[in-house]
């Protein structure tokens, strides 16, 4: 199913989803598009710039120092290091690995009360995203489904990821005040 999931088609693609039970959303973040920058495979660099609300040009040299190339992209295990070097004093970068292990739904909802999250995913379970980084800005919990609300770097509007179908191979990165 290689179709972008959004508010416009969620009821069509998930007709038995039921009612929205609760939502957690950040409203003070601007979406960034990868096409607005010069690199290829720069989804992680774009996502970090979006989350930290800093210039792409400030993130790129640090990402390059940690192995980013336009041919291979960014090693997901280095995202926390890149974020730590680019955030202002008084903050610390954090990471969690594996859906249901370090990255539970409860943890996502707790973090999203204060800050957006960089999600490095291997596969979204719907064959739309593969080996891609997005910015999580919300969680929508329905009677029969849970969806991550994301900026994917390809669209200005939010897209949705079916949390239940998300691959266990993934990690999240965010910042907290010290």
Range-by-range predicted roles:
Residues 54-56, 61-178:
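Conserved active-site-adjacent core of cysteine acyl-enzyme catalytic domains
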Residues 1-72, 142:
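Active-site-adjacent structural segments surrounding the nucleophilic cysteine of cysteine proteases
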